[in-house]
Amino acid sequence: GKIVWQTDVGKGAGGVMYGSGIDGEKLYVALAVRQDRPTAEPPNVLAALDLATGTVAWTVPAGKPVCAWGPKPCSPAHAAAVTVVPGAVFSGGADGHIRAYATRDGRLLWDFDTAAQPYKAVNGIEAHGGEIGGGAQIVANGALYLNSGYTQAGRMGNALLMFTAEGK
């Protein structure tokens, strides 16, 4: 088809990474900007666009990165595809955090550092989280599933995590 609308959400080096999500009203995109390209504006935001018009409804800056493994390499980039459920959009970060934002206004609802602790895996081996990058999180049977550990910036990990609505 034909282009209905087109919106430039981010400028400079970087941009929408891996995938977006929709909920019938808005399109949600996560922007990741390379740390060595400080001229990009706006840097590392989660943005919601009106699905009918392409108008930016809200943006949320990623903020200062807090990486469990230390300051380098540590990026606030939204480095994974987003996942949308009624009322919330999940975004995985290069800092190892999974965050949930309100779809209405972008308010932070929940933040969990997947790299702050080791996990006992179902096979008995200790798993470690790291960057969250690439594919989206999966929501099924009332749970959120995500991979934590990605070697793009040299921080490996190998955890497949599951969260329930109770936060477990």
Over which residues does each language-model region extend?
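Extracytoplasmic/lumenal domain signature
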Residues: G1-M17, G21-H78, T83-G134, I138-K168
